[in-house]
């Protein structure tokens, strides 16, 4: 194994093993839910696709949260968010919300690109079938005369 990938692998393993588990969990679920509601309500008026994605995302999160509560995995105490956050975290939260706002033209993902490509191929196939059907009708009309 080359030394650079080995060093990167060791570094990533060491860094990921020293992350405290509390940093990976939300501190206040009501804060997360209200932020999720804000994000979904802001993007819901854009178009039908964002509405459907928002609905599916909300259903998934509610189902996932319900499953976690039922299995007893989720044991987070309910603390007020103001006591847990420092002023530095408040400013970083504001920066994050500014950064996460939707742009006017969102980037096209690979899934969307492949979906559009499949639709274009299907439309071309349908057009070819229509042209072939027109030619077949024309040949049958000439042979029938």
Swiss-Prot record:
> What job does this protein perform?
Urotensin is found in the teleost caudal neurosecretory system. It has a suggested role in osmoregulation and as a corticotropin-releasing factor. The non-hormonal portion of this precursor may be a urotensin binding protein, urophysin.
**Which SMART domains has this protein been placed in?**
CRF
Keywords recorded for this protein, A-Z: Amidation, Cleavage on pair of basic residues, Hormone, Secreted, Signal
Q: Where is the signal peptide?
A: 1-22
| Location(s), subcellular | Secreted
- Please name the taxonomic classification of the source: Eukaryota, Metazoa, Chordata, Craniata, Vertebrata
Write down the superkingdom of origin. Eukaryota
Give the protein family: Belongs to the sauvagine/corticotropin-releasing factor/urotensin I family.
Q: Which residues carry this modification: Valine amide?
A: 143
Q: Name one GO cellular component term.
A: extracellular region
Primary location: secreted
| One Gene Ontology term of the molecular function aspect | hormone activity
Kindly provide the name given to this protein in its UniProt entry.
Answer: UI
